[in-house]
Amino acid sequence: MHSERAPFFLKLAAWGGVVFLHFPILIIAAYAFNTEDAAFSFPPQGLTLRWFSVAAQRSDILDAVTLSLKVAALATLIALVLGTLAAAALWRRDFFGKNAISLLLLLPIALPGIVTGLALLTAFKTINLEPGFFTIVVGHATFCVVVVFNNVIARFRRTSWSLVEASMDLGANGWQTFRYVVLPNLSSALLAGGMLAFALSFDEIIVTTFTAGHERTLPLWLLNQLGRPRDVPVTNVVALLVMLVTTLPILGAWWLTREGDNGQ
């Protein structure tokens, strides 16, 4: 009789892989509470919240956090608008070049970040646009659009066109149909796509390196701190903050898409 249960060694390998991937993250989280000033003294001498207080009083950290939040919020907003419009334009329409357009929409997230960053920097230099806040937002929006587009187009494909036709047959105009029929079906996909886009933007570093100029987002601040051993405890606190800000939206997006799939 065939058993559907996975072999023990396969389970062991899977859990070993999970531990291998997440152990460094747990180390950073643990040492954010370490009482020692040293980088990674083992075993930890105790627990303290001192470094959280120190980080909260550092103006350079607060400025980096504020900039990252602003960039992520604006890039997510742009991605929601452009990604939704692109998905709506490609939904239920067959025309020459449709597949090519879909490929171009997915290209920014498929290409290596260094290629995207270099291409954006070249484009900005060509039009004499100096790197700064605006260029960071544009750079982040290029790959955030992909996340929103994928979520929305997938939901569009699971939405029955007969619902739209029934709404129009009952006398609803285009706006009413969108407001009361289409948008409720897209709401969880939009929210999940927006949360994923925000998480991707908040911790993006490769594209940001090419487009930031003199600006310093939180990931760039962390990169600059690698050469300062005395600040390692504070750096661990900031790294923990980045992990929380990016992990929570990803978990929320997973939960939303799971609920949406179960409801279809």
From Swiss-Prot:
Its main location: membrane. Disruption phenotype: Natural transformation rate of the mutant is reduced by 3.3-9.5 folds. Mutation does not affect chemical transformation. The gene is ydcV. This is Inner membrane ABC transporter permease protein YdcV. The lineage of its organism: Bacteria, Pseudomonadati, Pseudomonadota, Gammaproteobacteria, Enterobacterales. Keywords: Cell inner membrane, Cell membrane, Membrane, Transmembrane, Transmembrane helix, Transport. GO terms for cellular component: ATP-binding cassette (ABC) transporter complex, substrate-binding subunit-containing; membrane; plasma membrane. The chain crosses the membrane at residues 13-33, 71-91, 101-121, 129-149, 190-210, 237-257. Involved in natural transformation. Probably part of the ABC transporter complex YdcSTUV. Probably responsible for the translocation of the substrate across the membrane. During natural transformation, may serve as the channel for dsDNA uptake. It is a multi-pass membrane protein. GO terms for biological process: DNA import into cell involved in transformation; transmembrane transport. PROSITE patterns: ABC_TM1. It is found in: Cell inner membrane. Residues 1-12, 92-100, 150-189, 258-264 are cytoplasmic. Belongs to the binding-protein-dependent transport system permease family. CysTW subfamily. Residues 34-70, 122-128, 211-236 are periplasmic. Pfam families: BPD_transp_1. Residues 65-252 form the ABC transmembrane type-1 domain. The keyword 4Fe-4S does not apply.
